[in-house]
Amino acid sequence: VLTSCKLVSGTPRSPSACLRVWFSGSDMNEKIPANGVGLVTPQIAECDTPFTFANGALLGSHELIYETYGELNSAGDNAVLICHALSGSHHAAGFHANDDRRPGWWDLAIGPGKPIDTERLFVVCSNNLGCCDGSSGPNAINPDTGKPWGGQFPQPQVQDWVRSQRWLAEHLGISRWAAVMGGSLGGMQALQWAIDFPDWVEHCVALAAAPGLTAQNIAFNEIARHAILSDPDWHEGDYLAAGALPTRGVALARMVGHLTYMSADGMSDRFGRELLEGSFAPDDNAERVFQVESYLRHQGSRFSTQ
């Protein structure tokens, strides 16, 4: 029985709050920390049972790539599912190699003695079905054509991710989740778990998430979508077969996305009208580059090349 469901909005400022590190991670790895999960190896679960999507599309078989941290107890009920956001992946903690520049995206929160304590909990994070980090998705090979699925891959919904995660839980011998948690789109998955399978979830933690999008959310997403669709390298979603990548459209979409991640006040506090290049002098003909412009360009470029 679901015993708690917690919605958390905003970004806590307390140094002790684990939520502050939701999308953080060190850029340098001089030494793998002793209090982390260390080196981790992604695993792949193969499902040969046909999977029917909420929209009626059928996938004969599929794969889910995932990582685990900690050990599952004999009852199979000390497991925690971490659901990633739109730009996340299964790599939530630890390092894949000694020379990795940064750990998994929630490394500061997952590990021995950390808020998500791997000395007590068995932590699971999978790459969502339909994503491009190792689970079956548009860049996987369609067995019927021998080519990447591209735009022909079924369009998943949150319910589909939750159902595929339930299959993974059963595959791993998990009897129920001690908690399902995630932020943003990951938080929506946590909520969907509580709705669809309440007997499977003891605690639901949804961070910066809601049961549905507002009109403004939908509008910003539409602009971001059209930025990608308008890129000549999009090729109706079959860009891999065309030997192209819609990096310009993705970069612009990411810039739009970052406008929604901060409030107007937060953006003013962080950037103001500070210049990175140029000046306000009337006789200065050099291009002015505001710090906020540089920030958006950097985020767009970085995301589009991942």
Regions found by a protein language model. Name each.
Residues 148, 159-178:
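Conserved acidic catalytic loop of the alpha/beta-hydrolase fold
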Residues 28-82, 96:
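Catalytic-loop region of hydrolases
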Residues 206-303:
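Alpha/beta-hydrolase-fold enzymes
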